[in-house]
Amino acid sequence: MAQFDVLKNPGQQQEAIPFVVVLQNARFDRSTTRFVAPLVLSRLANIVEHYLAPRFIIHGVEVVMDVFNLATLPVNRMGTPVASLADEESRVKLMRALDDFLSQA
């Protein structure tokens, strides 16, 4: 699966977190896990800083990225991608949120 692919959440909180987005660079595809961010239903998200929680519409569902709950998932638990956030606008929003979250400033 490619960086910025969106997959159905294989975890237990699928109602609140219907999707995850793969953040890991393809250079590390040999790994048995993928670094992902949960995509939480926007109406349930506790957004502290809006720039840290970019909004997306996935199959008609409004979600926000939750940078405070980044995780790794085993590849064998992940299904087929259902969407992609690899377009330039989405990539910029994702990377800006991650950069701000991880910045040393």
Give the residues covered by each predicted segment.
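Compact nucleic-acid interaction/catalytic patches
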Residues: Q3-V6, P10, Q14-R55
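C-terminal terminal-subdomain/extension
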Residues: F56-A105
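Short N-terminal helix-initiation segments at or just after the protein's N-terminus
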Residues: M1-D5, R43, L85, L98-D99
